[in-house]
C-alpha cells in the first residue's frame, strides 16, 4: 500500500512539473507563434496609416463567370474600399449594352473586410497583453484567453465566409445604388459582397408587376443571392426579379488570411486540449 502511495505521489510530482513547464514555457511559445501568424494575417488587410508610406495600393479585379457573359467588369479595391467600378451589362431581351461606373468622388466601404481586420486586431491585442513577463498561474486562465482569441478569430472568419442576407428593398435602399454614373436605371439593382476569398457582384434586372397581374404576390425574405421570380414592394410599385447575373473574382490575399485564421484556431485548440488533459488528474481542484 505504501509503495502504491509513493508511486502515486511520484507520478503527481512529475505531472505537476510538466504542468508548470506547460504554463511557464510552452504557453508563451504558442502565444508568440499565434502573434506571428496573426501579424501576417493583418498585413494582408492593407490600409492607409498601417505603417507604410503613401496611399494604399489599388488592385484591379476582373469579374467573370463560367455561366454567363451578360455582365463584365473591373472592380478596383483599395484596402477595405472599392475605389472604382466599371461594369458592362448586356440586356438579355435586345442585347443593348449598358455601361456604368463609380462616380469619381465616391468609394464604397466593404464592411466585411473592415470588420474582419478589426477582429484580427483585437485578437492580437489580447495576445500582446500576455507577454513573456506575464506568469500564468492556472490552466483556467489559459483557457479563458484561448476562448477569447478564438472568439475573435471565428468572428473574423465568419465575416468573410458568411455574407449578409439582405431583402430586395434593403438592396434598393443601399447607398451603392447611388454610386454610379450614369445613374442606374430604375429596373436594375446591384449588390457587392465578399464570399470566402471572392469579390462578388450581383446585378438584378426587374420588371413591374401590373395591378391586374394574376401572380400571387409574396414578398421575398432576406437572402445572399435572390433568384428570378423573387418579388418585393418599392414605393407604390410591386416588382419582380426577371434576371440575375452574378460575377466574381478571387482575391488571393483573402485566401491567405482565411488560411491564417484556420491555422491559428487549430493552435488555440491544441493548447486548450493540452491544458484540459491535466484537468482529468486534478478534477477535485483548480488546475
Swiss-Prot record:
Entry-linked InterPro entries: RAVE2/Rogdi
Pfam families linked to this entry: Rogdi_lz (PF10259)
Primary location: nucleus
Subcellular location: Nucleus envelope; Presynapse; Cell projection, Axon; Perikaryon
Cellular component, GO annotation: axon; dendrite; nuclear envelope; perikaryon; RAVE complex; synaptic vesicle
Disulphide bridges: none
Modified sites of kind N-acetylalanine: 2
Domain of life (superkingdom): Eukaryota
Swiss-Prot/TrEMBL keywords: Acetylation, Cell projection, Cytoplasmic vesicle, Nucleus, Synapse
PANTHER family, per database record: LEUCINE ZIPPER CONTAINING TRANSCRIPTION FACTOR LZF1, PROTEIN ROGDI HOMOLOG
Protein family per UniProt: Belongs to the rogdi family.
Subunit structure: Monomer.
Protein name: Protein rogdi homolog
Organism name: Bos taurus (Bovine)
Gene behind the chain: ROGDI
Amino acid at each position: 500500500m505504501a509503495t502504491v502511495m509513493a508511486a502515486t505521489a511520484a507520478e503527481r510530482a512529475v505531472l505537476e512539473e510538466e504542468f508548470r513547464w506547460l504554463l511557464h514555457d510552452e504557453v508563451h511559445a504558442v502565444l508568440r507563434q499565434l502573434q506571428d501568424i496573426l501579424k501576417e494575417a493583418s498585413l494582408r488587410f492593407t490600409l492607409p496609416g498601417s505603417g507604410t508610406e503613401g496611399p494604399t495600393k489599388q488592385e484591379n479585379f476582373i469579374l467573370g463567370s463560367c455561366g454567363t457573359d451578360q455582365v463584365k467588369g473591373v472592380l478596383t479595391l483599395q484596402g477595405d474600399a472599392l475605389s472604382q467600378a466599371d461594369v458592362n451589362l448586356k440586356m438579355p431581351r435586345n442585347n443593348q449594352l449598358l455601361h456604368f461606373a463609380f462616380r469619381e468622388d465616391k468609394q464604397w466601404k466593404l464592411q466585411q473586410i473592415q470588420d474582419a481586420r478589426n477582429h484580427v486586431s483585437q485578437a492580437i491585442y489580447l495576445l500582446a497583453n500576455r507577454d513573456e513577463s506575464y506568469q500564468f498561474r492556472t490552466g483556467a486562465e489559459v483557457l479563458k484567453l484561448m476562448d477569447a482569441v478564438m472568439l475573435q478569430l471565428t468572428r473574423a472568419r465568419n465575416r468573410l465566409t458568411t455574407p449578409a442576407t439582405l431583402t430586395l428593398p434593403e438592396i434598393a435602399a443601399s447607398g451603392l445604388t447611388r454610386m454610379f454614373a450614369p445613374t442606374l436605371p430604375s429596373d436594375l439593382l446591384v449588390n457587392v459582397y465578399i464570399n470566402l476569398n471572392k469579390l462578388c457582384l450581383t446585378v438584378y434586372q426587374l420588371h413591374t408587376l401590373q395591378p391586374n397581374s394574376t401572380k400571387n404576390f409574396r414578398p421575398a425574405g432576406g437572402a445572399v443571392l435572390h433568384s428570378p421570380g423573387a418579388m418585393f414592394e418599392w414605393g407604390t410599385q410591386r416588382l419582380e426579379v426577371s434576371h440575375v447575373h452574378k460575377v466574381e473574382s478571387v482575391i488571393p490575399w483573402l485566401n491567405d488570411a482565411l488560411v491564417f485564421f484556420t491555422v491559428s484556431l487549430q493552435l488555440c485548440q491544441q493548447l486548450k486540449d493540452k491544458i484540459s488533459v491535466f484537468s482529468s488528474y486534478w478534477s477535485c481542484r483548480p488546475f
